[in-house]
């Protein structure tokens, strides 16, 4: 399961307004967590881009909508607020017989979607992601190396690779590469965190933080980090609460 996804935007204030309104319209209750320069809604977090925090670009995120009416309301509200449409509400049968989605571009040009497509995939707000990469073969090799450790499967298709677990899915295609993305897999124990990191480093990929506790996030936050071939920060995390 995906534990969380983090992106960086030009303005934290505007991102908080836009995504806060998004999740209100999509029926998610509860206040976001704010701290450490981030705002987080369940499994999705935003921060402000800076010299030390790369702007997130060329990413697609689909958020779960409880109904087609919620998709419509979100798109109308977002476009009325000045966000550019990236696709009006409607069926998308190429993705599935019940698939109904709408799309806008966020302030960094990322494609944001509200989608109604059956039951929610996992607790949280994220339904799926699409990443772009310079080399589909290199990106696929990375995920083939690390995903078995975190109980995700990697499926090669014509022109794309899909990663599946027990919750949200993500797919990878070639194109202008996704940048500034942080994606964390949930780990059931510390041994899984270590296995994830060892698998990536053993396959020749770059460590971005060895396994260990990160109490800055919370006591018992055990994590390890790798860079994917496009430089995105990929994590496995065990919450020992």
Q: Language model features by range: what are they?
A:
Residues 53-54, 110, 168-172, 232:
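Short, charged/polar, Gly/Pro-enriched secondary-structure boundary elements
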Residues 2-11, 53-125, 127-135, 202-241, ...:
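Vicinal oxygen chelate
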Residues 6-45, 130-169:
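Core segments of cupin and vicinal oxygen chelate
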Residues 38-43, 104-107, 162-167, 175, ...:
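Active-site beta-strand termini and strand-to-loop segments that position acidic
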Residues 40-45, 55, 97-99, 164-170, ...:
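A short, glycine/Asx- and small/polar-enriched loop/turn
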Residues 15-19, 78, 109, 139-143, ...:
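Conserved active-site tyrosine of GNAT-family acetyltransferases
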Residues 130, 137-140, 149-214:
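Structured core of small recognition/catalytic domains
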